[in-house]
Amino acid sequence: MVKIRLTRMGRRNRPFYRIVVVDSRKRRDGAYIDSLGFYDPVKDPAVMSVDVEKAVEWILKGAQPTDTARSILSKFGVMKKVHEIKYGKKTEEEGNE
């Protein structure tokens, strides 16, 4: 199974994470298939960047985001975009019924 998860970078007591696509059997910091962005929790406020189009493409191919990765992707609207592509946009008429 392919997962979207965080891989730890940085030095001791200064974590920095890359958001990557990886085979679930690989180690946390092992080789990854594709890099989607980064997350720096040390800065105030936390700095994040995600390639939305790549993330949507991988999720539609079947990649499963971990809980933390899903939370970060949701902040960029990736999960909403995937939902709209899979199930269609909700129109105002459907919302009123």
From Swiss-Prot:
One Pfam family, short name: Ribosomal_S16
One BP annotation, GO: translation
Presence of the UniProt keyword Disulfide bond in the record: no
Gene3D superfamilies: 3.30.1320.10
GO cellular component: cytoplasm; small ribosomal subunit
UniProt keyword annotation of Ribonucleoprotein present: yes
Molecular function terms, GO-annotated: structural constituent of ribosome
Key words, A-Z: Ribonucleoprotein, Ribosomal protein
InterPro entries cross-referenced by the UniProt entry: Ribosomal_bS16 (IPR000307), Ribosomal_bS16_CS (IPR020592), Ribosomal_bS16_dom_sf (IPR023803)
Family recorded in the similarity comment: Belongs to the bacterial ribosomal protein bS16 family.
HAMAP family named in the record: Ribosomal_bS16
The name this protein goes by in its record: Small ribosomal subunit protein bS16
Organism, scientific name: Kosmotoga olearia (strain ATCC BAA-1733 / DSM 21960 / TBF 19.5.1)
